[in-house]
C-alpha cells in the first residue's frame, strides 16, 4: 500500500507497548483510522505534544506489513486548540463532541461532513471567551447537526402522528421516540403511559431546525436562549441521541451532561410512576 496523506483530528489513543502508542484519528476521506505510532512513549520521542486529543494534524501513514493496523510515518501539527485545554467547560464540551464522533464514525468510510463539523466545533470552542452558556449552545447545535448528518434529523415540519403540516405556535410537543413534533390535533389526544414527550418553545424549535441544517461558522450566529429553554433543548438533544443511536453506556445522558449537573425534566407525564421513571432516567 502506498503512503496515505490526510488532514486528521486526533480522537484519542491507548498505549500499545513499552514504547509505542495507538492513536485514533478522524480523516475526511477514510473516516476513523487507527494508527500505531512507534516510539511515541520514549522519553525523548519526536511525537511529544503531537498526539494529544483534539489536535488538528496532517498525517502520512501506510498499512503495516504484518498486521491490520496502519503505521504513522509523519505527522505535522496544524492547530493544537490550546484554548480548549485551558478551560474546563471547553474541554468538557470538546470531549463530548469527540466521543460522539467516535461512536458514529466508521473506519474506511468517507466522512468529510463529520470531519468538517468536528473541526468547526473545535475551532469555535477554542476561540470562545463567552463562558459556559455559549459552549452549551455550541454543543446542543453540534448534537443536532450530527444527528442530521447520520440520517436522524427529527421531523420538524410535519406532524409525526398524522403527517399534517405544522402551523406556527408558541409551544410544541416533541416526541422523543417518534422523532419529531405533534400537531395541535394530535397533541390534544391523551398520551400513552410511558411516552416521552417534551414541551419545546418556538425559539428553541428554531435553534433545533437551524442546527439540523448547518453548523454556525461564528459565535455571532448563535441566538441566545433563556436558561430554562436552553436546558430543555439541551436535555432533549442528549436523550434523542441516546435513544436513536443506541449509544454505548459510557456515552449515556448522565455521563455526558454538563458539569454543573443542570437537567431539564420531561414536562408531559401520565402518572406518578411515569414521572419517577423519567426523573431517574435523566
Identify the residue ranges that each predicted region occupies.
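Non-catalytic alpha-helical scaffolds and adjoining flexible linkers that form interface surfaces
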Residues: 1-282
Amino acid at each position: 500500500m502506498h503512503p496515505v496523506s490526510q488532514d486528521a483530528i486526533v480522537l484519542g489513543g491507548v498505549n500499545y507497548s513499552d514504547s509505542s502508542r495507538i492513536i485514533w484519528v478522524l480523516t475526511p476521506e477514510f473516516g476513523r483510522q487507527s494508527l500505531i505510532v512507534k516510539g511515541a512513549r520514549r522519553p525523548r520521542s519526536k511525537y511529544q505534544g503531537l498526539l494529544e486529543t483534539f489536535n488538528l494534524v496532517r498525517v502520512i501513514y501506510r498499512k503495516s506489513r504484518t498486521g491490520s493496523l496502519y503505521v504513522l510515518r509523519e505527522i505535522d501539527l496544524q492547530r493544537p486548540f490550546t484554548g480548549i485545554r485551558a478551560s474546563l467547560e471547553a474541554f468538557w464540551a470538546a470531549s463530548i463532541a469527540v466521543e460522539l464522533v467516535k461512536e458514529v464514525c466508521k473506519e474506511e468510510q468517507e466522512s468529510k461532513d463529520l470531519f468538517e463539523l468536528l473541526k468547526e466545533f473545535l475551532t469555535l470552542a477554542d476561540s470562545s471567551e463567552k463562558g459556559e452558556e455559549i459552549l452549551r449552545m455550541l454543543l446542543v447545535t453540534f448534537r443536532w447537526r450530527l444527528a442530521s448528518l447520520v440520517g436522524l434529523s427529527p421531523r420538524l415540519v410535519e406532524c409525526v402522528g398524522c403527517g399534517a403540516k405544522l402551523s406556527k405556535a408558541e409551544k410544541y410537543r416533541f416526541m422523543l421516540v417518534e422523532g419529531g413534533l405533534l400537531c395541535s390535533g394530535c397533541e390534544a389526544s391523551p398520551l400513552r403511559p410511558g411516552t416521552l414527550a417534551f414541551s419545546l418553545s418556538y425559539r428553541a424549535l428554531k435553534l433545533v431546525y437551524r442546527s439540523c441544517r448547518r453548523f454556525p461558522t461564528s459565535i455571532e450566529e448563535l441566538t441566545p436562549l433563556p436558561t430554562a429553554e436552553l436546558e430543555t433543548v439541551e436535555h432533549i438533544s442528549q436523550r434523542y441521541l441516546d435513544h436513536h443511536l443506541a449509544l454505548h453506556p459510557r456515552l449515556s445522558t448522565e455521563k455526558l451532561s454538563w458539569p454543573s449537573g443542570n437537567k431539564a425534566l420531561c414536562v408531559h407525564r401520565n402518572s406518578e410512576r411515569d414521572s419517577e421513571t423519567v426523573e431517574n432516567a435523566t
